[in-house]
UniProtKB/Swiss-Prot annotation:
Regulatory domain: region residues: 437-572
Gene: leuA
Organism domain of life: Bacteria
Lineage: Bacteria, Pseudomonadati, Pseudomonadota, Betaproteobacteria, Burkholderiales
Keyword Amino-acid biosynthesis belongs to the record: yes
BP term (GO), one: L-leucine biosynthetic process
Signal peptide: none
CDD domains: DRE_TIM_LeuA (cd07942)
NCBIfam families named in the record: leuA_yeast (TIGR00970), PRK03739.1 (NF002991)
Annotated protein name in UniProt: 2-isopropylmalate synthase
Catalysed reactions, as listed in the record: 3-methyl-2-oxobutanoate + acetyl-CoA + H2O = (2S)-2-isopropylmalate + CoA + H(+)
Names of required cofactors: Mg(2+)
Species for this entry: Paraburkholderia phytofirmans (strain DSM 17436 / LMG 22146 / PsJN)
Role this protein plays: Catalyzes the condensation of the acetyl group of acetyl-CoA with 3-methyl-2-oxobutanoate (2-ketoisovalerate) to form 3-carboxy-3-hydroxy-4-methylpentanoate (2-isopropylmalate).
Magnesium as UniProt keyword: yes
Length: 572
């Protein structure tokens, strides 16, 4: 690093705004949320999502409550074009959801973009071109007049083509790319020129998106930029001001929040901050920050673990264990003083009272998470190294969420015994908790066959002491197993690995089960020389643990499908 970085880097020039109003404002209602997970987020992946994963992500976003979703860059690839067509022709877009597509300022690309939208009831078409000095000079070799003319010509093309598609209600959006690095008077000039072409009205507004394509300054400067535009844009009553902060300086969430205070109506971003370089602004953190201030964000993260697993599986990117609200360790206290304060907070917290538990800005239960792992041991406590001991002594590598779950069991054990826990005791406790769960459903045996590309299982089990032979079909052994037992839970996460090597190798499988009536997640572990058998044992163990986590009424009907199955039934 340079001893004098000023010889290489320039500080960002602040906006002249001596009477700024945003510092005295608070956020009392949510902005319009626009997810760009399927476009900006997807294009930043090492391996972009295939059509199946994109559809899964789209449906997850709809389920969360997003009403605007940027789904593709249709002119960039046939894959993106085809995905837009599948959404439209397959009837996947709910009546209250508007899809958005992105296009550069070129006539042929704009035409291709509109072609992808034929037949859609409504859509946002998002036009952009770069306006910052380094892009004008280095990338495009254009003067300011050329940049403005490029944007206006593209706007005219969009307006002309849209007029030939009266069956679709279009909303136009314009982004001066790298707005955060553009001279603010010029950014206004280009935006005004584009909207002079489109002629939005208060009844049919256009969107002006002001992106921090590269985060270049502290969040207060970005807020000043937004407030200046909010005050000075022509046709302000006919525009929705949108922001699109990136996280290059690590302050995208703060920048977005201050931008809303400064006049922004809408925020574009991704779940958990996916996106180019350091990512887009994290919409989950933004929404839950509002929630903890008593403002309904309009997005539902009441099962945040499932959203996280979907995002991880679709993007192939892990979520950091310290990630706000969702990380595996954010509701975990290792410090003794923290543990003491949290215990005391829980002791006095009343169910219907304002949340005031120390060190916990949100109630984990509101997100579908449990209190089981809030206070747990670690190697510094004199009781821990649980995961290390299991891995070193028995070859079992626990997934992080299972580590958190199991540490609660160890904590209870050490609290009851008041003694130091040994490696052998940890292993015995682990088997009791997750491997040896044989009631109310006990695995006896199974056989598998294949028919027309689908797996069929014949499963022998004891349910509440009654032997049953169940059958099921599915895309694989576990899918067939779940169809066979017919319980009201699902496999939320599954993984497997070798426990030992060589001729007597054994496999360990871990299944994380979840269900509408199940409190938290229920883990099951299977260990067997046969990997499929290990996986079946893991799921059945997880089902037994899930059964223990539902109320008495749900338990009465838990195995109805299996008990009423027409398969063979004999007394034990």
């Amino acid at each position: 690093m340079l001893k004098n970085p000023a010889t290489k880097y320039r500080s960002f020039k602040p906006v002249t705004l001596t009477d700024r109003q945003w510092p005295s404002r608070t956020i009392t209602h949510p902005p319009i949320w626009m997810s760009t997970d399927l476009r900006d987020g997807n294009q930043s992946l090492f391996e972009p999502m295939d059509a199946q994963r994109k559809m899964r992500m789209f449906k997850t976003l709809v389920q969360i409550g997003f009403k605007e979703i940027e789904v593709a860059f249709p002119s960039a690839s046939q894959t993106d074009f085809n995905f837009v067509r599948e959404l439209i022709e397959g009837g996947h877009i709910p009546d209250d959801v508007t899809i958005e597509v992105l296009t550069q300022a070129r006539d042929d690309l704009i035409e291709r973009t509109f072609e992808s939208l034929r037949g859609v009831p409504r859509a946002i078409v998002h036009l952009y071109n770069a306006t910052a000095p380094e892009f004008r000079k280095i990338v495009f070799n254009l003067e300011k007049s050329g940049v403005k003319e490029l944007a206006q010509n593209a706007a005219r093309t969009m307006k002309r083509i849209a007029a030939t598609m009266p069956e679709t209600q279009f909303t136009f959006q314009y982004s001066p790319e790298v707005f955060s690095g553009t001279e603010i008077e010029f950014a206004k000039e280009v935006c005004d020129a584009v909207f002079d072409v489109w002629q939005p009205t208060p009844e049919h507004k256009a969107i002006v998106n002001l992106p921090a394509t590269v985060e270049m300054s502290t969040p207060n400067i970005y807020a000043d930029q937004i407030e200046w535009m909010h005050r000075n844009l022509a046709r302000r009553d006919s525009l929705i001001i949108s922001v699109h902060p990136h996280n290059d300086r690590g302050t995208a969430v703060a920048a977005a929040e201050l931008a809303v205070m400064a006049g922004a109506d809408r925020i574009e971003g991704c779940l958990f901050g996916n996106g180019e370089r350091t990512g887009n602004v994290d919409l989950v953190t933004l929404a839950l920050n509002l929630y903890t201030q008593g403002v309904d964000p309009g997005l539902d993260f009441s099962n945040i673990n499932e959203v996280a697993r979907t995002a991880e599986e679709c993007t192939q990117l892990p979520i950091h264990p310290r990630h706000p609200y969702v990380g595996d360790l954010v509701f975990t206290a290792f410090s003794g003083s923290h543990q003491d304060a949290i215990k005391k907070g829980f002791a006095v917290q009343k169910p219907d009272a304002v949340w005031e538990v120390p060190y916990m800005p949100i109630d984990p239960a509101d997100l579908g998470r449990t209190y089981d792992s809030v206070i747990r041991v670690n190697s510094q406590s004199g009781k821990g190294g649980i995961a290390y001991l299991l891995e070193q002594g028995y070859g079992v590598v626990l997934p992080r969420r299972l580590q958190v779950d199991f540490s609660s069991a160890v904590q209870r054990f050490t609290d009851d015994s008041g003694q130091e826990v040994t490696s052998a005791q940890i292993w015995e406790l682990f088997q009791q908790e997750y491997v040896q769960n044989t009631a109310p459903i006990h695995y006896v045996g199974h056989s598998l066959s294949e028919r027309e590309g689908r797996e069929r299982i014949k499963l022998t089990v004891d349910i509440h002491g009654t032997r049953r032979v169940l059958t099921g079909e599915g895309n694989g052994p576990l899918d067939a197993l779940m169809h066979a037992i017919g319980v009201p839970v699902r496999i939320q996460h599954y993984e497997e690995r070798a426990l030992t090597q060589g001729a007597d190798a054994r496999a360990v499988a871990v299944a994380e089960m979840a269900g509408a009536d199940v409190t938290g997640s229920a883990f099951g572990v299977g260990i067997d020389a046969n990997l499929v058998t290990a996986s079946i044992r893991a799921v059945i163990s997880g089902v037994n643990r899930a059964y223990a986590r539902v109320n008495a009424q749900a338990q009465e009907n838990f195995f109805d499908a299996a008990m009423n199955d027409a398969a063979e039934s004999v007394g034990v």
